[in-house]
Curated annotation (Swiss-Prot):
Superkingdom assignment: Bacteria
A GO CC term attached to the entry: cytosolic large ribosomal subunit
Source organism of this protein record: Borreliella afzelii (strain PKo) (Borrelia afzelii)
Name of the featured protein: Large ribosomal subunit protein bL17
Subunit field text: Part of the 50S ribosomal subunit. Contacts protein L32.
Gene Ontology molecular function: structural constituent of ribosome
Protein encoded by which gene: rplQ
């Protein structure tokens, strides 16, 4: 019997999959909303929820741990100063997925991933 895999491989090799997820998570944290296929967004959701949970405690160690995955200093700072304080009281479920239907070309299920609560904009 085939054992269940812990994550979706997305039909890519490990280095390609890691680069794809890294880029999608960074753009999700930058724009606070992202649109893609449902399968990709499930994986992005897993990674981003872990990153937000880790960023709730602002220590040098946590910043270094997250900087291994997020190389953009602006996004890393935004995660620690604007996004994670909004979710301080929430113990999980920081994102929501809204299904859009099927894509015209190949009938892939599309969705939007967004943060549940919006961070306050600096005026």
């Amino acid at each position: 019997m085939k054992a269940k895999l812990g994550f979706n491989r997305l039909s890519r090799k490990s280095s390609h999959r890691r680069a794809l997820l890294k880029n999608m998570v960074i753009s999700f944290l930058k724009h606070e909303k992202i649109s893609s296929t449902k399968a990709k967004l499930f994986e992005v959701k897993r990674f981003s929820e872990r990153l937000i949970t880790k960023a709730k405690v602002d220590t040098v160690h946590n910043r270094r741990e997250l900087s291994k995955f997020i190389h953009d200093k602006y996004i890393l700072n935004k995660l620690f100063t604007k996004i994670s304080p909004v979710f301080r009281q929430r113990s999980g479920g920081y994102t929501r997925m809204i299904k859009l239907g099927k894509r015209y070309g190949d009938a892939a299920e599309m969705a939007i991933l967004e943060l549940v609560e919006k961070p306050l904009k600096a005026e």
